[in-house]
């Protein structure tokens, strides 16, 4: 056991004992099955497991680093989700800047149980999203996987990632506040999860899309070292972070959209949050689309790019799963929408061009795809090329950099199962989420609930929970990713391993450099 691990374990035992002590004279679990208790927290029973929702892990003023909040001695209800971070286009879900809450599902709140812990970070880039989505409720995963599941909300968009350091020391941690929130949540887990039946020495982080990108970034942040012991990213990569110059341009664009003078940071800090959210409609000064905020290379909290020029040394020993979905962009580029209407060989190159993130001649790209796959339709090539040139390269870079650095405990998957619910959707971005969580029947799932879906879900749950429990996926046939073989688990109705299954696409897109969108 390393000195770091030993320190975490000792601290956890002391703090977990303190959590339990606050429950006296009440028992660890209330006698009523409707009101389980762990220390200060009164939760509920959900689908056969104990659920504790809306647990505060920190509190923060706008644009400054969050801190843990001492307990004042009063009992705390933990029976509903806390509010999510303010954001655009999230309907009627309660939003608040006071959003630093997490949720726990556990089969048994016994401090001696020592179950592996799986901590989930949500997608939505760094801009939107929450863990209140029914697809990411943790009861099924906790029950069937025999693990403790934790899901975390944190600050997003300008509230979590606007770069304000040029305005002075008060804002020294800006640009990475959302990441520091996640680190604070992981510190809470390390300190308290034993009271919920979890093992603080077996904490796995996993996340989809933006959640995976947040994990990749944490793997290069010194303050995150030792707080998790395995990781899995699902269609979410972060090769480079934003540089401070681009980050500053985005801050100035936000302030201009809000009609603030360039130096009026007090106005930005004190304006109503609803008005601040309106500013997110501003155009991004660096790339097309709405204004983007994400992690910043500040040389303090994030002293290097996550996976450039190589994989961060501090995380090479962390066992890791990396995965992507075969046709990610079917979720972004609606097959029933205008970008696909009238698609033909005559216009496909022009329509591909704005969707790819690697600067290659789209006419040449289409020629290569037609040469390798002469039976593919324009639609098939459109989705393959936009996925391969937009959503997939980051995963290839991260896996290759880990392999090149000698990180042998790396496993890669490709999710191929098309939706049986919507045939035009194919296998699209987010479609692997319900298979891992076991939430096949949840609103928003495209998986269906047939026998094939249930069988694949069981396999993916074994893979992920196995990594959390043992540091290896729970599928013995899954070979580690090494060069030049590039073993890849193919998740479909048939689960199998293939070596470098998209070799020619990988080589095609490697002919030009990849620059992380938003950097």
Predicted regions and their residues:
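Substrate-access "cap/lid" subdomains that shape
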Residues: 88-90, 191, 225, 230, ...
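Non-catalytic accessory segments of hydrolases
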Residues: 20, 28-176, 446-460, 468-477, ...
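Gly/Ala-rich beta-loop-alpha elbow adjacent to hydrolase catalytic centers
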Residues: 207, 211
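Alpha/beta-hydrolase active-site loop
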Residues: 173-193
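N-terminal secretory signal peptides and thylakoid transit peptides that target proteins
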Residues: 2-20
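Mobile gating loops/cap/lid regions near enzyme active sites that modulate substrate access
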Residues: 392-519
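Short glycine-enriched nucleophile-adjacent loop
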Residues: 212-223
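Alpha/beta-hydrolase fold nucleophile elbow
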Residues: 198-206
């Amino acid at each position: 056991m390393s000195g770091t691990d030993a320190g975490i374990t000792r601290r956890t035992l002391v703090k977990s004992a303190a959590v339990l002590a606050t429950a006296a004279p009440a028992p660890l679990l209330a006698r009523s099955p409707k009101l389980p208790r762990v220390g200060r927290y009164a939760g509920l029973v959900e689908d056969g497991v104990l659920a504790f929702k809306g647990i505060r892990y920190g509190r923060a003023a706008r644009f400054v680093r969050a801190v843990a909040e001492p307990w004042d001695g009063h009992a705390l209800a933990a029976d509903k989700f806390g509010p999510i971070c303010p954001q655009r286009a999230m309907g009627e879900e309660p939003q608040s800047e006071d959003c630093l809450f997490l949720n726990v599902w556990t089969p048994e709140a016994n401090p001696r149980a020592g179950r592996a812990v799986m901590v989930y970070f949500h997608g939505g880039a760094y801009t939107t999203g929450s863990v209140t989505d029914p697809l990411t409720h943790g009861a099924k995963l906790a029950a069937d996987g025999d693990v403790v599941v934790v899901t975390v909300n944190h600050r997003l968009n300008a509230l979590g990632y606007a770069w304000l350091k040029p305005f002075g020391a008060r804002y020294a941690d800006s640009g990475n506040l959302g990441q520091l929130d996640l680190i604070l949540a992981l510190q809470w887990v390390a300190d308290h999860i034993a009271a919920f039946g979890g093992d603080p020495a077996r904490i796995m982080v996993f996340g989809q899309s933006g959640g995976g990108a947040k994990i990749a970034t944490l793997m290069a942040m010194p303050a995150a070292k030792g707080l998790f012991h395995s990781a899995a990213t699902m269609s979410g990569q972060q090769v480079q972070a934003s540089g401070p110059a681009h980050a500053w341009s985005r801050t100035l664009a936000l302030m201009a959209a809000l009609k603030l003078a360039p130096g009026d940071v007090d106005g930005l800090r004190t304006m109503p949050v609803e008005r601040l959210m309106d500013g997110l409609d501003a155009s991004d000064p660096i790339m097309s689309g709405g204004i983007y905020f994400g992690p910043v290379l500040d040389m303090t909290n994030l002293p290097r790019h996550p996976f450039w020029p190589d994989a961060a040394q501090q995380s090479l020993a962390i066992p890791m799963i990396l995965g992507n979905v075969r046709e990610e962009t079917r979720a972004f580029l609606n097959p029933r929408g205008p970008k696909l209407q009238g698609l033909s060989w005559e216009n496909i190159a022009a329509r591909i061009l704005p969707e790819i993130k690697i600067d290659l001649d789209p006419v040449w790209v289409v020629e290569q795809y037609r040469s390798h796959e002469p039976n593919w339709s324009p639609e098939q090539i459109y989705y393959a090329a936009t996925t391969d040139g937009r959503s997939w390269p980051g995963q290839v870079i991260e896996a290759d950099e880990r392999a090149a650095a000698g990180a042998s405990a790396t496993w890669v998957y490709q999710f191929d199962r098309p939706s049986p619910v919507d045939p035009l959707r194919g296998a699209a971005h987010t479609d692997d989420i319900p298979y891992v969580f076991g939430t096949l029947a949840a609103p928003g799932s495209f998986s269906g609930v047939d026998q094939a879906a249930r069988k694949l879900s069981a396999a993916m749950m074994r893979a992920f929970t196995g990594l959390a429990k043992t540091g290896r996926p729970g599928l013995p046939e899954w070979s580690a990713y090494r060069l030049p073989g590039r073993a890849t688990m193919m998740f479909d109705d048939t689960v199998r391993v293939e070596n470098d299954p998209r070799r020619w696409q990988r080589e095609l897109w490697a002919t030009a450099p990849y620059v992380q969108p938003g950097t």
